[in-house]
Structures are given as C-alpha cells and as structure tokens.
C-alpha cells in the first residue's frame, strides 16, 4: 500500500511503479493492474475500506461524497438560515474550522462542550445544521472518510486485522503533511507484528 495526498500524486506514483514492475517483468504489460500495489490518496483509501465493509457498518455501499465546494455551499445556506452576516461570519473560515476539528476527532457534540465564546457558539450552530444536511442527503465529506475509517478500525478488531494482514508493506508520501486523523489511520493499518512502514517527508 502507498498513500499520498493528491490524486495527481497517486496517479504519477502508480505509473512509475507499473513502469518499474514491467521493466523487471514482475507484471505483464497486457494486465498491469493485476499485481500492482494499491496506490491511493488517504481519502480514496478511506472510501474504499468503508465501501468494502459497508454491510458490517450499516452504510450505503456508495455514499454521496461532498467535495469542498459542496460543503461550502451547505455552510453558506446554514449561515443564511441562521440570519448571520456572511461578511462577519465567513463561510469559508467556518468550513476550515469544522474541517480542522474533524481532523482532530472532534465531533459536533464534542465541540458543543468546548464552546467558550459567541463565535464558537455560531460555529457550533452552523456545524449542527451542516451535519443534519449531510445525514439527510446520506452524504459524507472528505474529513468523514478518514475519521469513519479510523473509528471502524478502532472498533472492529477483525476488520483491523484483515487490513493489517492485507497491507504487509506501507509507504506514506509527504508524511510531514499528515494531520491527527491521517496519523491515526496509518498507525492502525500497520501490522504490529512486523511494522513494515516507510515514510517520506
């Protein structure tokens, strides 16, 4: 398994690996993906794993994935619904705060406990509406893909063991850019029996 941050980086890495394996006659040019290592972004890896285990988790096999613009659109509507001035309560900044909190495993319920200012109360109100809209659309955002995958691995020992055995060697690109959720994701995927992991960055 190789994990990186962008689809472009994953594509370039995949092409390089396939080219090298073909040169070494390890894989056939006619069927290059048959024995190729799995190379994905963190988010696409999370989505793949959640989809594979959807029956166990009671999830849709192919949930709607909201990109950044979709998320921002919902947050703009939430700001409007609450009668807030978007010039004072910038939807882009609110989205960034929600994303950061999710990446640190803070849920909307957890954030409510942290509220210590009027601005945080506003963020919580927007976040609550945002999560309700996601639930209604049966959708997840990018942050949910990794956070939910981490919770799955933490809560289900058999699923964690399956992926630890499946990914015997793990390579992480641009490791210095990982956030708390991505670090936890990596840690849970590494098999403690041999700790075969290489990080770059």
Where are these regions (language model features)?
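Secondary-structure boundary motif
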Residues: 19-26, 81-84, 136, 155, ...
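Short helix-loop boundary/capping segments at the starts of domains
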Residues: 6, 19, 23, 55, ...
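ATP-hydrolysis module of ASCE/P-loop NTPase motor domains
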Residues: 33-36, 55-144, 167
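Conserved helicase NTPase motor core
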Residues: 1-2, 9-10, 38, 67, ...
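Generic alpha-helical structural context detector
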Residues: 44-47, 51, 96-99, 147, ...
């Amino acid at each position: 398994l190789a994990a990186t941050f962008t689809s472009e980086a994953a594509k370039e890495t995949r092409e390089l690996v396939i080219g090298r394996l073909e040169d070494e006659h390890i894989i056939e040019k006619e069927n290059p993906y048959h024995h190729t290592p799995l190379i994905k972004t963190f988010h696409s890896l999370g989505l793949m794993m959640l989809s594979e285990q959807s029956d166990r988790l009671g999830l849709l096999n192919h949930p709607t994935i909201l990109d950044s613009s979709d998320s921002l659109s919902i947050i703009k509507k939430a700001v409007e619904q609450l009668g807030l001035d978007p010039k004072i309560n910038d939807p882009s900044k609110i989205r960034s705060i929600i994303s950061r909190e999710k990446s640190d495993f803070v849920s909307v319920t957890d954030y409510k406990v942290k509220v210590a200012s009027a601005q945080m109360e506003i963020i919580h109100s927007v976040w609550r509406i945002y999560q309700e809209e996601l639930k209604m659309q049966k959708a997840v955002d990018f942050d949910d893909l990794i956070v939910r995958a981490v919770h799955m691995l933490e809560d289900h020992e058999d699923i964690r063991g399956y992926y630890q055995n499946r990914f015997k060697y793990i390579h992480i690109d641009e490791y210095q850019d990982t956030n708390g959720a991505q670090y936890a994701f990596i840690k849970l995927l590494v098999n403690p029996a041999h700790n075969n992991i290489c990080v770059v960055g």
